[in-house]
């Protein structure tokens, strides 16, 4: 059985190869065709409609912390007006505006322990098996670890609803608005990628 490091290296290589092949195929044939458009539209409608255009992220860096081989940049950025996402950016030593590195966004697990969010993949809390962001930073990747809605710093701001109760509340709030949590999660993921793309 491969070690975690060997597994990450092999899956990263496999994912890169797959992405390269998909890019080559995408350049030769359109992703959306007359045949696929109706399904695509139904799927989008079922999720809650089109996502808003990405606006200014208004990033704020809160603090920096040095670790062995990389630094943690605690930050937040705007997802939608009035909704900010706390996140941790892991930057390997030696990476700068002039010496860049590949970047990836990693989300925490979604299996019950709602108090945990970005700090688990960043290697600061929780199960070491899930410290994937820290492992990738040690391999030279810039890693963004954001909090998903209802986790860690994005739990009930009034502190009335805990864990799953707040998640059910948010689920119903989006459903009543004609959307769903998947729509919101995809929007948040898109904004995380917008943040990574905005870096030098």
What spans do the regions from the language model cover?
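Cap/lid segment of the alpha/beta-hydrolase catalytic domain
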Residues: 107-187
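Conserved acidic catalytic loop of the alpha/beta-hydrolase fold
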Residues: 188-200
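Short beta-strand element of the alpha/beta-hydrolase
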Residues: 99-109
